[in-house]
């Protein structure tokens, strides 16, 4: 397939905001043209993305870097390129004449994979590195939320562990202690006692349990309520809500144990019915898009607000800049329509609300994890007789 392409000049509306280099061709697709896709990642989310993308009649080939047994089972071609190897990913996309790149995890996005692909003239469904800091830095996200007037927990940011500990003693428990940077969903401690909060500061900032992610720390007020995940597809100026979802992060039954990247999810979340989606987007998504656009970086891709539904209304706990895992799995099971076309519409700045629809059925995803997760756990184990389990 040879897609049509045009060279855009600076100063042409939306594309000027995207800061496309003068010489980079912008590729767009007409209805009926087939595309070659590269999905980045190796988890259940990427398996779900491949499953959904391959339902499009426009897809000729799907590559996954590095992929897993599930993506191979869907007929995708797994390629041994790590999700964090930006040079390798760009080289792969060029070699295989990829028409659409779909990053799954946060690491390539915060590392600038969209910027790199854009420089190579390859459409990429995801935000640039500046916008991806919404997820990559909790302090940055708090700053944007405050500028945009988005409701969120009161917080303080620290780079000195002694000052952070003094604040813990002064504020008292319960508190939420967060590593500023990426920690695979495991850098948040809900401290029920002052000692737990002090230990969390020590682990994150002094012992560097999460490496460089703990160089800066965010201490937040403890919010009471029920959590929900609210995702919108965005084209830089338009945000279209997806159905709500709810994931459960505690490692053990009964919401007990340490936080994980997610042990399961379902959609919809009863706490956030779809008839409230537009109002929620107006409150927590569209103001962020406007703030980032004012910064000169329109947000393209999935913007995910992790919400706490409190007695005083919804408050944002965090933003992710990609599909959640495991929320992606039940969400994509409910999503109707051509996801390939929807992603291209987002990249091209012409997303239409009517292009998204979903089934009214409920979807559920459950995570099977190795013993010991999210702490040290064995890896490389073979999964037998359980990769596809039916629920009655």
Whereabouts are the PLM-identified features?
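A conserved helix-loop-beta module that forms one wall/lid of the active-site cleft
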Residues: 125-187
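Cationic, low-complexity basic patches in intrinsically disordered or flexible, solvent-exposed regions
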Residues: 3, 17-18, 23, 261
């Amino acid at each position: 397939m040879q897609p049509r392409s045009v060279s855009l000049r600076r100063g042409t509306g939306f594309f000027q905001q995207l800061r496309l280099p003068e010489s980079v061709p912008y590729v767009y697709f007409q209805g009926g043209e087939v595309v070659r896709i590269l999905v980045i990642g190796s988890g259940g989310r990427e398996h779900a993305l491949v499953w959904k993308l391959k339902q499009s009649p426009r897809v000729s080939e799907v590559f996954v870097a590095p992929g897993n047994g599930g993506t191979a089972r869907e007929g995708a071609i797994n390629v041994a390129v790590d999700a964090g190897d930006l040079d390798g990913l760009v080289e792969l996309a060029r070699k295989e004449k990829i028409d659409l790149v779909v990053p799954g995890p946060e690491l390539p996005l915060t590392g600038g994979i969209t910027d790199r692909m854009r420089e190579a003239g390859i459409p990429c469904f995801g935000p640039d590195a500046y916008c991806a800091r919404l997820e990559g830095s909790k302090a940055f996200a708090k700053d944007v939320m405050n500028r945009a007037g988005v409701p969120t927990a009161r917080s303080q940011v620290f780079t000195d562990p002694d000052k952070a500990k003094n604040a813990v003693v002064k504020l008292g428990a319960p508190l939420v202690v967060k590593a500023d940077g990426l920690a695979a969903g495991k850098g948040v401690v809900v401290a029920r006692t002052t000692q737990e909060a002090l230990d969390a500061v020590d682990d994150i900032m002094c012992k560097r349990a999460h490496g460089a992610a703990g160089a800066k720390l965010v201490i937040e007020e403890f919010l009471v309520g029920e959590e929900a995940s609210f995702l919108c597809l965005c084209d830089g100026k338009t945000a279209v809500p997806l159905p709500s979802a709810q994931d459960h992060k505690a490692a053990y039954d009964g919401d007990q144990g340490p936080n994980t990247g997610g042990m399961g999810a379902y959609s919809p979340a009863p706490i956030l019915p779809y008839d409230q989606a537009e109002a929620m987007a107006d409150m927590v998504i569209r103001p962020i898009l406007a703030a980032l656009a004012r910064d000169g970086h329109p947000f393209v891709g999935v913007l995910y607000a992790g919400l706490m539904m409190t007695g005083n209304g919804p408050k944002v706990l965090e933003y992710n800049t990609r599909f959640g895992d495991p929320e992606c799995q039940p969400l994509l099971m409910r999503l109707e329509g051509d996801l390939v076309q929807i992603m291209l519409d987002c990249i091209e700045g012409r997303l239409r609300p009517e292009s998204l629809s979903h089934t009214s059925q409920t979807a559920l995803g459950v995570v099977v994890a190795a013993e010991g997760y999210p702490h040290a756990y064995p890896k490389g184990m073979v999964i037998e007789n359980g990769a596809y389990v039916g629920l009655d």
